[in-house]
């Protein structure tokens, strides 16, 4: 298998064109985010925002003691209080929440473990966990629920496909490079326990109607990543973006399912910006233009985009921000 280079953590992604191989003009009007607001102001980085729809709970991960990560929740995005949902010397990352079931799903790499698994827990029942996947030689991460909460999609990367020199940094923090030969997207039926392999890819995300999945895939030359969509049975895989010298990561759906927001940067840059594209590959628009890292977006049902950034005076200390986008 051809090796693929993945910049993990906060290094992101790309310059683009479309699935139809036609050149796309990028709309760039300059950063004009009148509603831009900082949501967290923590001494340590806050990552992986999920939620905040119509002022509801916001879930995210927080680095602790410069090493570990745990999942936290704000009942209101702008409340000062944060409740801790996970604990211990683990790396608990990429939370997602399903309102229909009241469950949180996240990826956990326990201290000293050489793998990571998907866990779920009821938001209202504290820290009682249910282990969904069980692997001793793979990283399983980026869970995403369908609307009903009975299906969970996630990615899986075999432990042997990582560069041993960089393995320790995968669920850590920073710009470390990890060599990946293959990543897979799996669909789990939470009622029956059935697992189905959908194909190769990374960072899957269910569409609002539960009929499609957005995800990241490597180019054939292994020098870039692009955004794709497919049906939930793995059929009709369509490429939306094409980056020859960069990376596109973290696709998230608009509330109506017609657009995707994602982060993008050239591979020789540590900064990243946010972009929006229609699901037919048209109307690529750059949202942020900043020398900081702007990534890990989440698009709420009331039109806000939450994202992670070290802009302003927070260079190196990544916090959660949001702005209104219709």
Predicted stretch roles:
Residues 57-58, 104, 152, 210-213, ...:
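Hydrophobic beta-strand positions that form the internal "hydrophobic ladder"
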Residues 50-52, 96, 144, 205, ...:
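Conserved beta-strand position repeated across blades of beta-propeller domains
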Residues 2-5:
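Positively charged n-region of N-terminal signal peptides that target proteins for export
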Residues 53-54, 99-100, 147-148, 208-209, ...:
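Residue-level detector of Asp-centered blade-edge/turn motifs that repeat once per structural unit
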Residues 195-266:
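Eukaryotic tandem repeat interaction scaffolds
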Residues 11-18:
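Hydrophobic h-region of N-terminal signal peptides that target proteins for export
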Residues 41-44, 61-72, 86-91, 107-119, ...:
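A flexible loop/linker signature enriched in serine peptidases of the S9 family
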Residues 22-45, 74-91, 121-139, 180, ...:
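Multi-bladed beta-propeller domains
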């Amino acid at each position: 298998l051809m090796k693929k280079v993945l910049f993990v953590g906060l290094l992101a992604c790309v310059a683009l064109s479309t699935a139809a191989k036609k050149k796309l003009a990028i709309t760039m009007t300059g950063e004009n985010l009148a509603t831009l607001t900082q949501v967290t102001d923590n001494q340590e980085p806050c990552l992986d925002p999920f939620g905040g729809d119509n002022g509801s709970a916001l879930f995210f991960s927080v680095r602790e003691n410069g090493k570990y990560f745990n999942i936290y929740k704000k009942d209101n995005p702008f409340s000062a209080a944060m409740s801790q949902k996970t604990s211990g010397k683990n790396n608990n990352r990429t939370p997602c929440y399903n309102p229909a079931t009241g469950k949180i799903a996240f990826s956990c790499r326990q201290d000293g473990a050489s793998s990571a698994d998907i866990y779920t827990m009821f938001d209202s029942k504290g820290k009682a966990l249910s282990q969904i996947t069980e692997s001793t030689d793979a990283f399983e991460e980026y869970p995403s629920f369908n609307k009903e909460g009975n299906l969970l999609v996630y990615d899986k990367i075999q432990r042997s496909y990582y560069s041993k020199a960089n393995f320790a940094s995968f669920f850590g923090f920073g710009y470390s490079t990890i060599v990946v030969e293959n990543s897979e997207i799996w669909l789990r039926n939470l009622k029956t326990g059935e697992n189905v392999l959908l194909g190769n890819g990374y960072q899957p995300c269910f569409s609002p109607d539960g009929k499609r999945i957005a995800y990241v895939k490597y180019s054939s030359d292994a020098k870039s990543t692009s955004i794709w969509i497919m049906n939930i049975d793995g059929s009709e895989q369509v490429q939306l973006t094409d980056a020859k010298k960069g990376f596109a990561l973290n696709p998230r759906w608009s509330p109506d399912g017609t657009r995707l927001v994602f982060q993008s940067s050239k591979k020789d840059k540590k900064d990243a910006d946010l972009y929006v594209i229609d699901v037919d590959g048209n109307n690529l628009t750059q949202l942020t233009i900043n020398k900081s890292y702007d990534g890990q977006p989440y698009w709420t049902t009331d039109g806000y985009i939450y994202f992670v950034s070290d802009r302003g005076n927070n260079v190196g200390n990544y916090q959660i921000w949001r702005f209104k986008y219709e």
